[in-house]
């Protein structure tokens, strides 16, 4: 702005002011000299302005771009931070899956015979063994649980399942799963449960005939829509094992009618989707036919984020996701299980087994 103003001021001086100036001179040449000097000054100023303008036009072309290295470092740092956060998150979820809690509970049953007052039941479900090494870990776990000295051991199904790679590839090695189950069941031969060891099958397990063969090595009784009886002091209680959901219609009336009101019955169903059918079935003389229902399968959702879970549960399973409840005088337990489906990760849930003490009478 200022160079332009100076230029026009100079022109104005030359044209209008210089001719009228009273410059001391001997003749007209003095006035002409003054004009020439002014013109020369203007010419020099014009050249100066040209160079200034030329400089201002060229300067933007010489501007250097900023180096990209700091930006690349920033992006790399962000990705590294995200990777570390994800690694920490999944590491935490994996650690949760490896911590087993022994949940203790006391249940009061009015129909429990006096001889069984104080009897303890260890309920273990959903081991989800994925190979021989995993079977060895499960066997080692059971040796530690033997220190609890339960009177009865009840296994809740889904003993072996495929690995993450099997799930991704859509494959299932039945021979390998059978070998893993056999190793686990064989390790239970010395498990101290003086009143018996009972089990039901889950949807991921083999057929009843194959499961009976595998469990025989561990002296475990498979209950597939069948009843096991425990006797003590001339009295007895019944353990009714229900077949997995995939084997026929959920109608347990044939089983329930074999009992009378007042009998003490523990019902074991791998999937809590069967609980509604168990509750609607009636005893031979009508009324509720069981006192306690034990179930598993859901893993509690395994990973819980807000109202969403990693596992897709049916409406029936969602009704009994995990924990204790009571309906029509019947106690219901849905365990979150020991193992995990597909991958060993938990969030908002826990690996658990249950040591249940049965007492005669009504809850205080």
Can you describe what each PLM-predicted range is?
Residues 123-125, 153-158, 196-203, 223-226, ...:
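Active-site neighborhood of phospho(di)ester-bond hydrolases with catalytic His/Asp-centered motifs
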């Amino acid at each position: 702005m200022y160079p332009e103003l100076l230029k026009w001021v100079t022109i104005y001086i030359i044209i209008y002011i210089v001719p009228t100036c009273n410059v001391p001179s001997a003749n007209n040449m003095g006035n002409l000299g003054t004009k020439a000097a002014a013109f020369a000054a203007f010419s020099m100023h014009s050249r100066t302005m040209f160079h200034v303008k030329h400089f201002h036009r060229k300067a933007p072309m010489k501007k250097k771009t900023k180096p990209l290295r700091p930006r690349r470092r920033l992006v790399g740092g962000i990705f590294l931070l995200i990777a570390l956060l994800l690694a920490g998150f999944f590491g935490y979820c994996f650690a949760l899956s490896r911590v087993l809690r022994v949940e203790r509970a006391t249940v009061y049953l009015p129909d429990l015979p006096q001889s069984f007052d104080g009897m303890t039941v260890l309920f273990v479900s959903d081991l989800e063994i994925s190979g021989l090494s995993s079977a060895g870990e499960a066997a080692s776990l059971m040796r530690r649980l033997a220190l609890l000295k339960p009177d009865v051991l009840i296994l809740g199904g889904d003993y072996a399942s495929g690995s993450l790679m099997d799930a991704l590839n859509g494959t299932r090695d039945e021979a390998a799963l059978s070998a893993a189950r056999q190793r686990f069941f064989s390790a239970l031969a010395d498990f101290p449960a003086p009143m018996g060891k009972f089990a039901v099958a889950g949807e991921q397990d083999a057929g009843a005939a194959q499961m009976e063969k595998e469990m025989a090595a561990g002296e475990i009784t498979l209950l597939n829509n069948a009843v096991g009886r425990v006797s003590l002091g001339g009295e007895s209680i019944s353990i009714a094992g229900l077949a997995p959901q995939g084997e026929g219609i959920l109608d347990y009336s044939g089983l329930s009618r074999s009992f009378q009101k007042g009998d003490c019955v523990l019902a074991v169903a791998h999937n809590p989707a069967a609980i509604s059918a168990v509750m609607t079935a009636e005893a031979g003389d009508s009324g509720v036919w069981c006192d306690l229902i034990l179930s598993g399968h859901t893993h509690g959702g395994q990973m819980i984020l807000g109202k969403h879970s990693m596992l897709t549960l049916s409406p029936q399973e969602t009704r009994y996701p995990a924990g204790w409840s009571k309906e029509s005088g019947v106690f219901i337990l849905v365990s979150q299980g020991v193992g995990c489906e597909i991958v060993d990760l938990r969030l908002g849930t826990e690996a658990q087994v249950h040591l249940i003490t049965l007492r005669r009478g009504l809850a205080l």
